[in-house]
Amino acid sequence: MLLTETQKFDIFTSILDSSAEAPCAQICNEFHQGNLLDFNTVYNFGKQVDLLTIEIENVNIDALDRLEKEGLTIYPTPKSIRIIQNKATQKNFYKEKNIPTAAYFHFAYLEELKHSYHNSIIKFPFVWKAARFGYDGTGVKIVRTFKDIENLPQGECIVEKLIPFKNELAVIVARNHDGDVTSYPVVEMEFHPEANQVEYVICPARIDDNIAKKAREIALKVADAFDFVGLLAVEMFQTEEDEILVNEVAPRTHNSGHYSIEASNTNQFEQHLRSILNLPLGNTDSKVAGIMVNLVGAEGHTGEVVYENIEKILEIDGVTPHIYGKKITKPFRKMGHVTIVDKDIVKARKVAQQVKKIIKVISK
């Protein structure tokens, strides 16, 4: 989706990805397969480009640091990525910058967590999060019993009290090198209860204007604290008391902004390019209400992918599917998304629910 926008700007693109079958390999000008966590792979790739950006934050940060010191322009900056890569350092950053976030405990390994529980420092229920390498719902678990603790993986983690909340919200902020900044409307996210993956993204969020204003102000504060350049997705909770707490951020184009391709004056992918190229930022207003439905692999299906009933959703006005080009499906793997647009958010929501029931991502 980002490469679609680079083509409009006639930008020569070189991509590094771990998979030889990455869909981007068919679209970019030059493709390199390699381990994103390997220093030499990332460093050698970076020596061949004029400007480097990321699509996933799990990348060898030491290589990026070296490249930046040698003069390569990298956005977002390695300094920002290093903080964001680790949920513990990310939470510490929010605390230092007086950015509202849920109270937390940091543990270097699982035995520390168990010791803390036995000494009544942490209590059930709580949310366990792996400090690193969480992605699309992985690395997050709700812990209600000691048996749940026993089933947690080893390694560095954070623990947060399970806070009742009204809504999960997100704001995408765009900021260029000159410090020009703008934000997209607040969106509302609905998650799958088991996979902890986004099922629906709803724009605009169905919240009071004062809550939306507060969320956008906090998102802008986060971007400013990072001195961020690029696109920053700020995920937040609206608590029962209408507090806004920052959950985490993604330093890249994000699932919560996919609706913008059809619904916004400037989609998030073009906006990311404008930001990192230090161009004027585009209009972030929505033209219509937009809802995104995630397309993920159905449970019980692993193998060559089939998009069952895709022709049926194409009969519905305002519905646009985006298929990512991945050949193999497996349970809960993100395979695409569908955008629904309408002037009426209520109508769009009904169509989104209809689409969710109709289309299925299965295997042959």
Where are the predicted features?
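Peripheral (often C-terminal) accessory segments that flank ATP-dependent C-N-forming ligase machineries
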Residues: 274-364
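Short, well-ordered beta-strand elements within core beta-sheets of diverse protein domains
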Residues: 161, 261, 338-341
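Phosphate-binding core of ATP-grasp and ATP-grasp-like enzymes
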Residues: 153-207, 212-246, 250-258, 273-283, ...
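Structural motif corresponding to alpha-helix initiation and N-cap regions
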Residues: 35-39, 61, 110-113, 146, ...
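Active-site nucleotide/adenylate-binding loops and adjacent lid/helix of ATP-dependent enzymes
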Residues: 81-170, 174-222, 356
